[in-house]
């Protein structure tokens, strides 16, 4: 049995907000009608609609709009959503000016969130939530969620640990090979550069901006490091990595990545044996769908913590397992009342318990906790769960009804020359660096953590699919999602364009904002050519006047957010942003239950 077996789903336009999830819904067993009567599948505006009806599950409908918290005029499509929410600013930090992502990142995340809402609604119905369920989300809500760590840091009272300035990988060897470098500790970083003959001062100064690039989306590295790379061959770069403990990965083209696996961006595998005891109690009527369920999270960095955070927003009780002394990222600057603003963006509202999972006593304690949990979620390095005796089979022996969730880098599909499964390395290996930039920009992974965040969303979706299957089939379930699945979902439109004989990459200047007298504006994709043609007569105007002039011509456009610290005062979106008890900025939930 599959989670959505015997579930019919009507899907209506716009395609940009629905297409990313159709294959996933089919892989989960749903019967899809993507062209309901009277609905144009190519309609450019929303909201999109996913209406699910299942035997003994009732009806659940998810609506997805471009603008759910932003005014319609400021969130007309992918380009304007990226501009208004600050996504263009964050992606452009490496280059020193706002740049639009050439992939439909906000729309893809919104579509994934819509599927999560459907799964959560159906799960709630199966668990006893009364009445029909309707929920709404938006590409703007999705964008704010993906930017939540950057927004929290920008609006904290402390400064960043390193200055924000243009720069960053990839590096380029003497033969022209662009490559990403990964070193999670200063030792491998220093040994790598010393093996290539880099100056000691540059090695020392470069470590901190390189280390913090995941947090800041930029890395102003000393020029001598780039010069060192340009002076040596790719073969020597690889030798230096092998001898130092660092890892390198060439920036691959999209054509260098094998075909995506069919079946969606995750796997959902039920156990063979049915569970004899009741799985869990029904929720009180009108409660959130996951109320009464416990999620045990042993996550680090972004992917698993974000997945658990989303499950918490849907009502689950999340218990986070931290090492003795607590998660060191709790103190990562900038802080709000001594707690990292970035950490709060992913872990707000979770309970925490310190356990030494490397010790037999800690492993035994964690197994005892798993015996009473509904979900166990982790993103440990490959093989670690087995070494600790905390793999799916071992935990199933203490809790046969457990949903065991692994959010990984490469899933079970190691690619040739695949490096460690971190965000920028997966971007480099899978062609995301090429897809994310138009044809007049050199391929380069975005320093915005595109895959960690989308991978976290997919992890939450996989857990919801597993919980629904467990509820319907009465069996424990193992689910796995990955950064690789996130990369393939994000690059699928480019791959499909190439299969149809069209250009994989977007044209020169695609989603590049237009400069005004005091800032930048972004036209919608549909209005971009006309806006560029008339813009020479408007570029000396202030941004608000230039936007108004374009709108007077019937062209959609909005101002580009270039300062995340100013967003709470921005009348377009400020009312949707709040503060927690620490004073840290909080973005709105990605869902509204109607």
Locations of regions flagged by a protein language model:
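Acyl-CoA thioester-binding alpha/beta core of soluble enzymes
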Residues: 1-76, 83-326, 335-336, 340, ...
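Glycine/threonine-rich flexible loop motifs
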Residues: 52-53, 363, 380-391, 416
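Flexible glycine/proline-rich, aromatic-decorated loop/lid segments
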Residues: 82, 422-437
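N-terminal glycine-rich dinucleotide-binding loop that anchors FAD/FMN and/or NAD(P) in oxidoreductases
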Residues: 83, 336-356, 428
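Glycine-rich, N-terminal phosphate-binding loop of Rossmann-like dinucleotide-binding domains
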Residues: 299, 356-357, 379-380, 429, ...
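Structural alpha-helical scaffold elements that stabilize or flank donor/cofactor-binding regions
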Residues: 368-369, 418
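An anion/phosphate-binding loop that grips the pyrophosphate of nucleotide cofactors and donors
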Residues: 373
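Hydrophobic acceptor-binding patch used for acceptor engagement in glycosyltransferases
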Residues: 376
């Amino acid at each position: 049995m599959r989670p959505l077996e015997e579930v019919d789903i009507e899907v209506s336009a716009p395609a940009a907000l629905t297409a990313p999830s159709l294959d996933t819904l089919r892989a989960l067993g749903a019967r899809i009608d993507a062209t309901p009567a009277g609905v144009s599948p190519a309609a450019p505006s929303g909201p999109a609609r996913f209406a699910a009806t299942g035997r003994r599950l009732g009806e659940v409908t998810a609506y997805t709009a471009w603008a759910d918290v932003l005014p319609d005029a400021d969130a007309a499509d992918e380009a304007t959503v990226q501009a208004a929410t600050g996504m263009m600013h964050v992606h452009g930090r490496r280059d020193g000016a706002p740049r639009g992502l050439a992939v439909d990142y906000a729309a893809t995340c919104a579509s994934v969130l819509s599927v999560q809402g459907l799964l959560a609604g159906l799960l709630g119905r199966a668990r006893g939530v009364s009445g029909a369920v309707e929920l709404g989300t938006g590409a703007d809500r999705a964008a704010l969620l993906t930017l939540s760590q950057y927004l929290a840091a920008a609006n904290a009272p402390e400064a960043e640990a390193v200055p924000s300035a243009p720069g960053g990988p990839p590096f380029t060897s003497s033969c022209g090979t662009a490559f990403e470098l990964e070193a999670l500790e200063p030792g491998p970083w220093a040994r790598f550069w010393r093996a290539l003959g880099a100056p000691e001062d540059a090695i020392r100064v470069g470590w901190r901006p390189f280390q913090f690039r995941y947090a800041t989306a930029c890395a102003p590295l000393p020029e001598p490091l780039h010069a060192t790379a340009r002076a040596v061959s790719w073969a020597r770069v690889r030798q230096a990595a092998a001898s130092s403990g660092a890892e390198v990965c060439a920036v691959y083209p999209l054509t260098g990545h094998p075909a995506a696996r069919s079946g969606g961006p995750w796997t959902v595998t039920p156990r063979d044996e049915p569970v004899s005891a009741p799985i869990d109690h029904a929720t009180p009527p009108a409660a959130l769908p996951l109320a009464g369920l416990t999620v045990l999270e042993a996550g680090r960095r972004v992917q698993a913590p974000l997945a658990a955070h989303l499950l918490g927003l849907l009502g689950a009780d999340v218990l986070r397992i931290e090492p003795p002394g607590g998660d060191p990222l709790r103190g990562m600057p900038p802080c709000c009342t001594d707690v990292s603003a970035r950490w709060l963006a992913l872990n707000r509202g979770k309970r925490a318990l310190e356990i030494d999972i490397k010790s037999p006593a800690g492993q035994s304690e964690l197994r005892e906790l798993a015996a009473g949990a509904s979900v166990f979620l982790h993103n440990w390095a490959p093989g670690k769960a087995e070494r600790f005796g905390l793999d799916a089979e071992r935990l199933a022996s203490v809790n046969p009804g457990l949903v065991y969730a692994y959010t990984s880098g490469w899933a079970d599909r190691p690619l040739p020359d695949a490096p460690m499964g971190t965000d920028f390395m997966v971007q480099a290996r899978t062609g995301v660096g090429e897809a994310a930039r138009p044809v007049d920009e050199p391929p380069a992974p975005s320093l915005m953590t595109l895959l960690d965040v989308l991978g976290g969303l997919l992890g939450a979706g996989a857990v919801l699919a597993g919980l629904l299957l467990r509820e319907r089939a009465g069996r424990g379930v193992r689910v796995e999602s990955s950064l690789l699945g996130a990369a393939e979902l994000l690059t699928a439109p480019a791959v499909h364009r190439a299969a149809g004989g069209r250009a994989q990459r977007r044209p020169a200047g695609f989603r590049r904002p237009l400069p005004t007298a005091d800032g930048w504006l972004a036209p919608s994709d549909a209005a971009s050519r006309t806006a560029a043609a008339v813009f020479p007569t408007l570029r000396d105007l202030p941004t608000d006047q230039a936007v108004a002039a374009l709108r007077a011509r019937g062209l959609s456009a909005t101002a580009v957010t270039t300062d995340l610290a100013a967003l709470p005062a921005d009348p377009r979106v400020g009312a949707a942003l709040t503060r927690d008890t620490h004073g840290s900025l909080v973005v709105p939930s990605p869902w509204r239950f109607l």
